[in-house]
Amino acid sequence: MNTILPSDPARDDVLAGRPTLWLNPSYRKQAIDTSDLPVSPADVASARQNWQRLAPLLAECFPELKDTGGDIRSELVELKELREALGYRTREFGNVFIKADSHLPVAGSIKARGGVYEVFLFADSLARQKGVLVDGEDIRKLATEEARSLFSGYTVAVGSTGNLGLSVGIAARALGFKATVHMSSDAKAWKVERLRKLGVDVIQHEADYTTAVENARDIADADPTIYFVDDEQSRHLFLGYSAAASELASQLDERGITIDEENPLFLYLPCGIGGAPGGVAFGAKAIFGDNVHAFFVEPVQSPCALVHMMSGKQELVSVYDVGLTNKTEADGMAVARMSAFVAKVMREMLAGVYTAADDDLFKLLRMAWITQRQKLEPSAAAALLGPDFLLRHKEGRRFQTLNVIEEKMSQATHVLWTTGGSFVPEEQFQHFLDQAESIAAPSDRNDE
C-alpha cells in the first residue's frame, strides 16, 4: 500500500532519504504507567531476577563469563579523544559516554541480551516440563548430558539479518539444541559463515528481513519440536534487553552521576525492528521515569520505526509504502517494517528518531577506531550522532524548548549505545575502514 505521511517538519527529509530528526508528537510524561501496555515495570524487575537465576548456568556454558559470575555486561566508556573528534567538546554537551554493547561477551552485540535470555529461559522451561529440572535444583543441571540429550531433540529457530541469529545460534548450540537461522538477502557473508561453523543450519532467503521472519514462523508453527524466537512479537526478547537499564544505572551511580529532573539522561539507540532499543528504552523509563529521553536512530532508507510512528496509523507502515528502498550497509538496521509490539509500547514513550546516511556511518566508524580504538560495525556507529542532532539540529533545539531543558543541557548525560562490532572479522573491518577513507563529501543534512 502507498502511505501519505502527515505534515511534519521532518517529512520532506524522510521522503528524500536525507538525514533528519523527527520528534514524536505523542511523547508524554508518565507514559510507562499506561495500563493497557503489554509489559510493565514489574516485568522488567522479573527479567532482572531471571538473569540472576540463570547466571550460574551462563558461567558454566561460556568460559568468558566466569569472571563476572555469569553476568553479560558491557563497559560504560567515557568519550575523550572521540568526543573531541565529534565536536562535543563544549560544556553544553554535558557528560558523554558509549555503552559498549559492541563488545558484549558471548555474541559481540546487544543481541546477546535478548537472544541468550530467551533461549536459556526456553531451556529452563522445557527441562522443568520434562522433569529434568525441579524446583530447588541447581540451574547448572541444564549443562549436564541428561539435559543436553533432551535439548538435542529440539530446534531453536529465528529470523535475522545477522546479530540476533548469532546470539540465538550461539546460545542454542551451547546448550545442545539444534539451531536454524533464517537470514535475509542483506545478511553479511561473515555472519553466515560464523553460524555454520557453530553447526547452525542457515537458510538464506532471497527476500528482506520481514519475509525471512514470516517464513521462519510458518515452518516453526508446523513442527512442535521447533521453538521460534519471534523478533517481531517476543516479550522475552524485549524484557531481556530491558534489564540492561539497571546495569547502566549502577554504572552511572559508580561514577557519581545523578539522573534527576535537573540532570537529564539521553539514550541514542540504533533500531532495526525495534526490540532491542525498545526494551532498553522501556527498562530505562522504569528506572529513571521522565528524566530519561530515548531516541532511536535508523538509516535514511530503512527508517521503519520513524515512518510507522509518524504515520499515526495502527496498521504497520513499511518503508516501501512511502517510497524508500530499505537498502543500507547497516545490515542490523535493514528492516522495512517495525515490530507491532514495540510500536504499541513506545507510542508515547519514544522521544524521537533521527536518521543517518550510510556514508556518515562509515566515517563515524573510522573516527571511533582511530581516536579511541572502539571497533564498531556501521549500525553501531549511528549512535554517535545523537548529541549532535539534539544540540545543533533545529528540531533538537525545539525538543529542548518543549521539554524545558535548555538550561539543563550542561548537566545532562548522553549515552551512545553502540550495538555491535567486536565480532567483525579483521578483513571485513579493514574493508569498512577503506570504505570510509574513500568517502570525502559530507551528507546533505539540513540543520536549519
From Swiss-Prot:
GO molecular function: D-serine ammonia-lyase activity; hydro-lyase activity; pyridoxal phosphate binding
Keywords annotated in UniProt: Lyase, Pyridoxal phosphate
Highest taxon in the source lineage: Bacteria
Catalysis: reaction(s): D-serine = pyruvate + NH4(+)
Cofactor(s), by name: pyridoxal 5'-phosphate
GO annotation terms (biological process): D-serine catabolic process; isoleucine biosynthetic process
Positions of post-translational N6-(pyridoxal phosphate)lysine modification: 111
Keyword set includes Lyase: yes
Coiled-coil spans in chain: none
Gene3D superfamilies xrefs: 3.40.50.1100
Keyword Methyltransferase among UniProt keywords: no
Enzyme Commission (EC) number: 4.3.1.18
Family: Belongs to the serine/threonine dehydratase family. DsdA subfamily.
Family matches, as PANTHER family: D-SERINE DEHYDRATASE (PTHR48078:SF9), THREONINE DEHYDRATASE, MITOCHONDRIAL-RELATED (PTHR48078)
Name of the protein this chain belongs to: Probable D-serine dehydratase
Source species of the chain: Rhizobium etli (strain CIAT 652)
Gene this protein is translated from: dsdA
